[in-house]
Amino acid sequence: MPMYNREHTRHDPPFHHICYAESTDGVHWNKPELGICEINGSTRNNVIVLSETMDAFHVFLDKNPACPRDERYKAVLTRPHRQLWCMLSEDGVHFRMGWMLSDNGVFDSHNTVFWDERLRRYVCYMRDFHDGANGERIRDIRRIESTDFKNWSEPERISYTDSPYDFHMYTNGVQPYFRAPQLYVAFPARYTERKEWTANYDALCGAEHRKWRMQFHPRYGLAVTDGLFMTSRDGKSFRRWNEAFLRPGPESPKRWVYGDGYAAYGLIATPTGVEGEDDELSFYATGNVWSDTPVQLFRYTLRLDGFVSRSAPYAGGEVVTQPLCFAGDALHINFATSAAGSLRVVIEDEAGNALPGFDSGELFGDAADRAVHFDGNLAALARQPVRLRFILRDADLYAFQFCTEGK
C-alpha cells in the first residue's frame, strides 16, 4: 500500500516535495530510492514530484471501470490563483500534469476525491468559507461531482444533522468506508481560534514558543485544532459528532497547537500482533507541528467499525431499529460485553411483535464478526419488513449486517 506526503524547503521560493512510501502491513514503512527527482545533485530519494507552485497533493486509485489504464492513479492538487488541478499516473509513482478541475473554491486544504460506485460518478470535497452569524468568515466543506473527471458541478455546501454549531472545518477527510462502501466516514479537523491571550495560555504547554509564533500572526499562537468524526449515506447531509474524536492529548511542548489532529486520508485493517485477535483499524494523523523538528505522522488504532457504539450500563438498555428489509440468510454483529454483560437479539414483525424462533438468547464476548444463531430460518424473513431489538447489559453494539453465509 502506498503513502504520499508533502515536504517543503524554507527557501524563497519554497520547493514542495511530494514523497512516496510503501508498506505491506500499514505499520512498517519503506522509502524506496526511485531515481525520479534530483535533490542536492542526487536522485537517490523517494521524491516523485518537485514543484514551487503546488500544494495539497491527494492521490486516489480510480475504481471507475471505464478509467484508462494510464490514468488509474489520479492526484488532485492546488495551483496558484485558487485552482484545483489533476495529475495522472499508471503506476502511482510517475505522474504527468493533467487539467484544471475547478477554480470555484479555496482549495488550500486537503481536497479529497474518489469514485463512488453507487452514484457512478466522481465526488470531490474541498474547503471554502461562509459568513457566520457574527460576520466572521467560517471555514466549511463543499462538494462537487463529475461523471468524466473533467466537467464538474457547482460547489454545494454540506449540511449537518443534530449539530447546530458553526465550527470551522479545516480539513474534511471524507471517504467511503471500505467495510461498508455505501457509508461515508469523515475525519475533519476542527479549527478553534480564541481571539485574545488569557491566563490559560500562560499555563498551557509551549507558552513561550506560542508567543514567538504570534509575531507573525496572532492565530499562529491562539489557534488550536482537534479531530472530529462524521458519517453520511448521501454524501450531502452528515451526522457530525460535536465532541472530539481525536483530542490534542496530554500537554507537552509539541502539543495543543494549530495543526494537531489532521487526519491523513485512508483507513487500513492491521493485525494487532496477538494471535487469534480480530484485526484493528489503523489511521494516521499529524503531530509535532510548529516545532524545530519535522512534522510527524502518528498511527492510531481502534477496533473494526469502532467509531461509535450503542452502549448500555449493567442496568440494561435496548436499541430497536426502524422497520427494514434485508437480503441473505445470516445476521452478523460486531459487539463487546463484560464478563457479566450480555447482548440479545430479537427479530420482530413490523408492528413490534416478537417472531417465534427468532430470539438469539444470551450472547457474550468481544468479536468484530459474530454470527448470530436463531432456531428459525432467517432466509424465510428476507425481503419483508422486520424490526431488530437489541437488548444490552454492560455491552456495546458497533455494527450489524445481514449476509449470505459463505459469501
Protein language model features and the residues they cover:
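Carbohydrate-active catalytic/glycan-binding domains of CAZyme proteins
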Residues: 1-407
